[in-house]
Amino acid sequence: MIFHILFNYNQSRQVMDEKIQKVLEEKIHESTSRINEISTLVTSSGQDSPEEENAFGQGIIIGRLYNSFYYQSRRILKRNPTEQEFSEFIQLLKEHENELSSSFS
């Protein structure tokens, strides 16, 4: 009984469209697999230290993901994402934090 209540509670809290979530998952894997291109961008930017290069590279990846999230919300849902959907986007980034941060470590 408690599992059923918790399962339904978690299901009712998820607002992000499944299509958008799937696109974002694919974009995360695409971004981390194209690390050579992003590294070239980072290197050409002339950052002063490895820490700055790391932060800049992660910023590029997060920017790509945010752009996809916003664009897909507009394309699929025909509207801007809600605050709840944005919170779920942040949660998705947190779930993939190790994968995203290890790209530039």
Region roles according to the model:
Residues F3-S45:
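Short terminal alpha-helical segments
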